Amino acid sequence: MVIKLFHRHSVFSCVCILALAVSITMAVNFGSARMNAKASTEKPKSTVSESSQAVIAPVKASSPNEMRAVWVPFMSIDMSREEDKSEKAFKKKFDNIVSGAKKCGMNTLIVHVRPYGDALYKSSYFPWSHIVGGTQGVNPGYDPLAYMVEAAHKQGMQFHAWINPLRIQLSGTPSIIAQDNPLTKWKNDVSKKDWIATNGDGKYYNPAYSQVRKLIADGAQEIAKNYDVDGIQFDDYFYPTQNPEFDKTAYDNYSKSASKNGKPLSLMEWRRGNINALVSLVYSEIKAVNPNISFGIAPQGNVQNDLNMGADVSTWCSVKGYVDYICPQLYVNFDNPVLPFDSAAQNWHKLVKNTNVKLYLGLAVYKSGSDADNGTWKKSNNILAQQVNVGRKTNCDGFMFYSWDYLNKDQTKEEVQNVMKVLNS
């Protein structure tokens, strides 16, 4: 997940989401790694004070199996800039992550295995990632994913494979696109060139086409079939823009066809339908090979932003056949003037109507002790600990922390120590 704020059966279910979201948009800057969101005038008040530096009384976890995960983005395992790109060097880097995360009380790693339409494993669908080989398409001579799963399990930790489903290239990364990349194969094929969509300097798979959705789903199934992962997770990157030019040809063709039998869906309704079709297909393909693997999504915490990106989170949380868990990225604190953390947690709890869908809360370790959000993250050193308490009171099923690197920085040291006390109480 580069850092972002929040980065069906009928598409009309978006009406339910809008009602619950109360048109709230978080007015918070989340840095260069996750997307920013627009603010709304709705200003619910927090019921939690975070002004005190005192250690707070922990709320007990409702289950001994509470999720305590940390995201490991591709930057944390990037070997492309390392002088030593060997298998031994990679394993040493990842072993340090496993031992460090376990020491911090984590029980699950969410690791980037397909950041740019590529693979940190041997794939029949996607080229080798430049993250491990230095250049996309170059075989590193070993299987990073196989080792990471084995290393995590040896330490008693679960491993979830993290996928960016649509992103292929952004801001010149990766700098070289492999010859066996679907982008290379499709861009010069008149019948397939629209399967790739462009937004600014980014290139993306276009989920309007069933063939593209099948490719993404087959890629997820490949992981489920070939590796002993405990889960597979999509990030929040779906449609990167609301600009109708992004998929104009596909939508125009749909509209012409749909007009013959009635009124076409709006662009946003249609896009949400495309993403729902993708999510449902991925879910079914994973379950077809291993029903025990969890499939989850980590959408932005702002529901309106999710809708704008084509993410019909209300349907995913209420209808069978989409996800096993949802983990909104609630990267706000209790002082947020638009959406305090506790209000956001309660809103998401209300969205989860399918009792088989687990609710995890994504927490912003990276903001702890920083100047983010007008310095409000410096007002207390127990914000994360209080957020865990709120999550437990809200009956959520666990937490995911962004990100691994920030569990070990001086900036976040006191916050991490305090939240560990609550997690391990």
Language model feature labels by segment:
Residues 105-140:
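Aromatic-lined carbohydrate-binding/catalytic grooves of carbohydrate-active enzymes
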Residues 25-45:
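Sec-dependent signal peptide cleavage junction
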Residues 322-340, 348, 355-425:
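Substrate-binding cleft of secreted/luminal carbohydrate-active enzymes
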Residues 92-118, 227-229, 322-323, 394-398:
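Catalytic domains of carbohydrate-active enzymes, especially glycoside hydrolases
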